[in-house]
């Protein structure tokens, strides 16, 4: 197991799949990271040397927002919508679909399960 950005990554997975488990990194960013490392994306994470592991961690921390930074940024954006009393902020408060989806059908289960934002 490799520990990068507060996430345990499985050694047996390919590099681009393992990196995608870090919150804030998708497959596209993981492929870019593999290009910078000079390693094939299909290479298993366990096959990398310790130097490459440290370089991987360094590339991710310096060039990408991950983990709690992304969560905080998203939370601040939602809170901004709530503070300016926009329609989208109101929908977030109510726990309803924000982007114009129907609320008669599928949103019923979401309304039951979703935690409502408190002001």
Curated annotation (Swiss-Prot):
PROSITE patterns found in the cross-reference section: RIBOSOMAL_S13_1, RIBOSOMAL_S13_2
Biological-process GO terms, alphabetical: translation
Annotated localization: Mitochondrion
Transmembrane portions of the chain: none
Primary location: mitochondrion
Keyword Nucleus set for record: no
Annotated keywords: Mitochondrion, Ribonucleoprotein, Ribosomal protein, RNA-binding, rRNA-binding
Described purpose of this protein according to its UniProt entry: Located at the top of the head of the small subunit, it contacts several helices of the small subunit rRNA.
Protein name: Small ribosomal subunit protein uS13m
Organism field: Prototheca wickerhamii
